[in-house]
């Protein structure tokens, strides 16, 4: 598709991620570390609540299984992320061997090969972020669409991230981002997201009787 903006003489060729609803009030163009350009459109839309359901579910967040639900379903972490992670390690090792400043005050300039390798690393980081975001969006939408009430363990993620053995795994899993998605989607569609004590077996409750 194409997009016309005031500061550009020619229309911009764009790939739409979704259909825009409502009247657009502002447009923001940004560029990420992988040299990709994004256009963010702000519009106001009335979101209709979904039909009321009788089903509820309790979920626990984990690392081996990303979500463990009380109805017996387990959702594994995205495999694509692990695949990209292996590629990222190789590229980062190659990057470290290229000419660049290696400590504070080092004036060694970045070589052309270093800059090229750095862009490759940024692109893989972007692919990981895109894959993870897509996974979280789809799973959060599925849970919200299929359940009227979702009970979730109230985790102290900030405290857990201080644990060096867990910090990277928790950050990679994006627990906070997933919970945020559940919160705003529950508000949009008239669902209830209830936080319970970490000692309450939320994934062991009956999904039909609660």
Q: Which residues does each PLM region occupy?
A:
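Positively charged, helix-rich recognition surfaces that bind polyanionic ligands
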Residues: 3-7, 18-210
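Short Pro/Gly-enriched beta-strand edge/turn motifs at strand-loop
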Residues: 8-14
């Amino acid at each position: 598709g194409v997009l016309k903006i005031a500061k550009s003489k020619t229309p911009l060729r764009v790939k739409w991620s979704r259909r825009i609803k409502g009247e657009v009030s502002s447009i923001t163009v940004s560029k990420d570390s992988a040299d990709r350009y994004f256009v963010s459109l702000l519009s106001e839309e009335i979101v209709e609540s979904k039909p009321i359901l009788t089903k509820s579910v309790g979920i626990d967040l984990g690392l081996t299984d990303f979500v463990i639900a009380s109805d017996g379903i387990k959702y594994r972490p995205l495999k694509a992320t692990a695949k990209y992670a292996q590629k990222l390690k190789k590229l980062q090792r190659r990057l470290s061997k290229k000419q660049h400043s290696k400590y504070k005050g080092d004036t060694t300039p970045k070589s052309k090969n270093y800059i090229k390798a750095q862009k490759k690393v940024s692109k893989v980081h972007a692919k990981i972020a895109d894959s993870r975001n897509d996974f979280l969006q789809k799973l959060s939408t599925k849970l919200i669409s299929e359940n009227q009430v979702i009970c979730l363990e109230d985790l102290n993620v900030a405290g857990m991230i201080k644990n060096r053995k867990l910090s990277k795994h928790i950050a990679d899993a994006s627990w906070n981002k997933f919970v945020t998605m559940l919160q705003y989607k529950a508000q949009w569609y008239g669902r209830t997201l209830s936080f319970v004590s970490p000692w309450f077996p939320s994934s062991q409750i009956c999904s039909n009787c609660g």
